[in-house]
Amino acid sequence: MARWCAAQGWAVHPLAPGSKLPPANCRRCARPSAERPNPQYIEHETADCQCIEAGGHCHGVRAATKDPDRIDRWWSAEPRFGVGIACGASGLVILDVDDHAGADRPADDDYLPGVQLPEGATAEAFRSGWDTIAALCEVRCAPLPWMDPPTLTVLTAGGGLQAWFRVEDPELWHPAAGRLGWQLDLRAGRSYGIAPGTVTSSGTYRALGDCRTVAPLPSWLEEDLRRTGHHRKPEPKGKRPSARQLLATLRPPKGDAYVESVVRAEVDQVASAASGTRNQTLYSAARALGRFIPAGQLSESEVTACLMAAGTAAGLSDTETRA
């Protein structure tokens, strides 16, 4: 199944036998905790992981690949691995319809946030995500999204469903749980779906029907997903100035040459940080510059803008920099 998925253009990664989760990282990559100390751990950024570069599958979805040789090595070593599908790297979003008995119920107007329920519908009519998606389709006068056009749809081991869709801009979609509706989740970006045939302790994931191709995301559903914040607008090119441009225009109040010199030094260190040290360097810079905010020597927006630009120059994503 992993080779077949890769042949469709989807990036795959292993799931631990009998589980929906990736296998544990190697000792070098397993971050320690108070409960689980690990003296063999080496601080590094996932994007620079030597294990992934060498063909390993540490860090789960971040190791996803379409390389048939690497896939053969992984599943030859452990044929019981399940198959995870990296959404963003595969150009996919996956609508996850849950069937969780006993799940907490929201307020009546939060079963479908921002949508007026069908006439006569009450909270008692909602027993699972199946009822939620049916109600949304009724309001939109649309068929179930995996039916027209048909798309690869997987019945989960827990009684739910995952409907797979193609998108043109996968990097702009991000996952969220319950934002579209009660027991409706979206898998996108660095989240993953589970391929049919994967066996977990709860049962086997199975394809629904005969369709094995993935259809484009229906336009009506795309509109609702955008409305509920699953899609971000692309940042116009050139909108964010580079670290060098920011440094050229930054003028701390009162002509404080010392503050300016510290800002320049810290931003330069972040922008030129070597792989494996970027997160720590960014953290140190944030602490160093943050001390000027209470005194009014720098504004929070100035510090944030400089660090975001420096992080970009260092090769960090916006998410990594904000973290």
Regions found by a protein language model. Name each.
Residues 1-239:
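Conserved phosphate/metal-binding and DNA-contacting active-site motifs used
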Residues 6, 160, 167, 199, ...:
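Modules that initiate DNA replication and primer synthesis
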